[in-house]
Amino acid sequence: MSADHPFAAYHRAGGTARAEVAIATAPLTHYIQEAYHELDPADEEAPIFRDDLEHTVEPLLRRGFRNTIILAAGGYNPPHYGHAELLTHVLHHGGEDLNIIAAIMIPIDDTNLKRKFGIAENPIILPKSLRVSLCRNSPLIPNNVWVYDQPETEWHAFRSRLEASITSSGFTVNFMTVVGPDHISIASVHSPARWSCSETIVSDACRPADFVAGHHKNLETRCGTVKGVPELTIRFVPWTEGQRKPNVSSTDMRKLIVSCDATELGSTKGLAGKALCHEELVQWILRELPERAKMSAVPVKGESTAVHEW
């Protein structure tokens, strides 16, 4: 345990023999840094949550309360303001009972993005390092959001270390996924099992949801066989902030990448006001995708395209 760990003094004082001095709160940053250090020893002191904006509140674990960390996994190919809008709304309005203290964005690996495109030729796949950078550098992403940049294969071990470290210090921590209404609808329901969660939170902050009354006729006659009932809790956080911004998706962004002239790509006719850190993205596109007009922006069915985009 490092000397600056929030419970270092507690352990030096004698552990359980001095339980009366146990800290009621502790910064989540320390626990993430410790768990992450095993993945990347060179980044032991890498910053976790940004502190460059006003009114920053460091995510704190609270003893005796549920502490929820939401997992926002997706393609982010590329990330756009809808992602930021969804995270911001859920973090602020998820409910006091959940006590959501932070979110972790998990851009999926390049290989999974390629699988999503099926048999599409020359698909637009932004490298994970770029997608991570666009999410981290965007001022629209809330300060209590951390971007996980390691391979997906390392995620579950990282989470286990993080969870074990937090609980061993006397705190309770829960993980739940967050998705947009394109993943939870009348027709289908997102399963958070891939991320070892049994709870998910959804909001129509970024686009309308078809399960909200008044969207259209929701009752249909269907016949089928139900095999097993998975344990799943869904929390819906409705948008209550007035008129939404126009819908946008990563697919829309890729279509613009293919179709926009180089002189318009960085303007409002292109990616400005839609993609996160659009200037950084445009620079990369112009440098790395000289033949972008010939690239595929949307998946083509063939092999499995089960990796959902968010």
Q: What is the role of each PLM region?
A:
Residues 1-310:
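Nucleotidyltransferase catalytic core that binds NTPs
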